[in-house]
């Protein structure tokens, strides 16, 4: 049980550290509460998929094949650059309607970042807590704990971001905000690439 508590505490600390997921949640929560929450659900769905990949042992194949890792890294960066472009385009003077699915954005954001899977592969084995429970079950339990705390933290960040924007009464369609949101997508893309 000490291992599980240590895992929980370290997971909280890691999730709270400013990184691509937190930036993504903040950026998408500027739209409205619903958009932010859908992104959070999408990110956590991606975490479920990463956990299942580890539980079923596919992770070792992916870890040994750097072509797959590089593909996701470059595809992820291009996707985020695309989101930056869409952000600029939807707020231009032509007023082009862009259909957005914030849930899928969250799922894609999590799945295209190979660092998440590699992190799980490196992180989870350090917190195995039983000699009698199969490792795959332990990975599932650890993944569930990680997803649960991420859901709470990401949701809190989303709500706080949205409340802050409402409190300071910012025009989300102003050129400065649009460029800032696009810039954040580019920064997240570059972080995945590095």
Placement of each model-derived feature along the sequence:
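Flexible cytoplasmic inter-helical loops of multi-pass small-molecule transporters
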Residues: 89-102
């Amino acid at each position: 049980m000490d291992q599980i508590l240590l895992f929980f505490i370290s997971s909280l600390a890691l999730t709270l550290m400013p990184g691509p997921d937190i930036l993504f949640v903040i950026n998408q929560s500027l739209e409205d509460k619903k958009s932010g929450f859908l992104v959070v659900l999408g990110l956590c769905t991606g975490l479920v998929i990463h956990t299942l990949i580890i539980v079923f042992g596919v992770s070792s194949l992916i870890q040994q094949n750097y072509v797959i890792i590089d593909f996701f890294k470059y595809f992820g960066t291009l996707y985020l650059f695309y989101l930056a472009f869409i952000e600029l385009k939807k707020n231009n003077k032509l007023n082009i309607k862009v259909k957005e699915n914030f849930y899928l954005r969250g799922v894609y954001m999590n799945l295209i970042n190979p660092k998440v899977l590699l992190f799980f592969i490196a992180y989870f084995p350090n917190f195995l807590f039983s000699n009698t429970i199969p490792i795959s079950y332990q990975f599932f339990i650890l993944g569930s704990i990680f997803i649960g705390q991420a859901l709470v933290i990401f949701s809190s960040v989303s709500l706080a971001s949205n409340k802050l924007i409402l409190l300071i009464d910012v025009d989300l369609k102003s050129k400065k905000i649009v460029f800032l949101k696009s810039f954040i997508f580019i920064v997240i893309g570059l972080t995945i690439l590095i």
